[in-house]
């Protein structure tokens, strides 16, 4: 059984036992999280959400992604600025899908 959930502005296909990387969620390690914005469960589409469906998971890790370099450059103006950014993420293990 699989489902498509909406979290962090993205749609993610999940199955029980999967570990997914999503946008940062507030919470400590080993805390249970529930996703109630379920768009599809086992072939049944919602409009826009499936009524009564929810996906439950556990927070496994809080971390930051790889560093990216952002450059601000203006030619002939002697302006050259380099910024760094690391996007925070949460790793969640999907425990069960309820339809």
UniProtKB/Swiss-Prot annotation:
GO terms for molecular function: rRNA binding; structural constituent of ribosome. One of its GO terms (biological process) is translation. GO terms for cellular component: cytoplasm; ribonucleoprotein complex; ribosome. InterPro entries: bL21-like, bL21-like_sf, Ribosomal_bL21, Ribosomal_bL21_CS. Keywords: Ribonucleoprotein, Ribosomal protein, RNA-binding, rRNA-binding. Belongs to the bacterial ribosomal protein bL21 family. This protein binds to 23S rRNA in the presence of protein L20. Part of the 50S ribosomal subunit. Contacts protein L20. This is Large ribosomal subunit protein bL21. It comes from Mesoplasma florum (strain ATCC 33453 / NBRC 100688 / NCTC 11704 / L1).
């Amino acid at each position: 059984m699989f489902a498509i959930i909406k979290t962090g502005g993205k749609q993610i296909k999940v199955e029980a036992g999967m570990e997914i990387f999503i946008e940062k969620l507030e919470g400590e390690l080993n805390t249970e999280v529930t996703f109630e914005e379920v768009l599809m469960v086992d072939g049944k589409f919602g409009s826009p959400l499936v009524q009564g469906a929810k996906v439950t998971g556990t927070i496994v890790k809080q971390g930051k992604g790889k560093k990216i370099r952002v450059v601000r450059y203006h030619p002939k103006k002697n302006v050259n600025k380099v910024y760094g950014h690391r996007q925070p993420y949460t790793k969640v293990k999907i425990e069960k899908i309820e339809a």
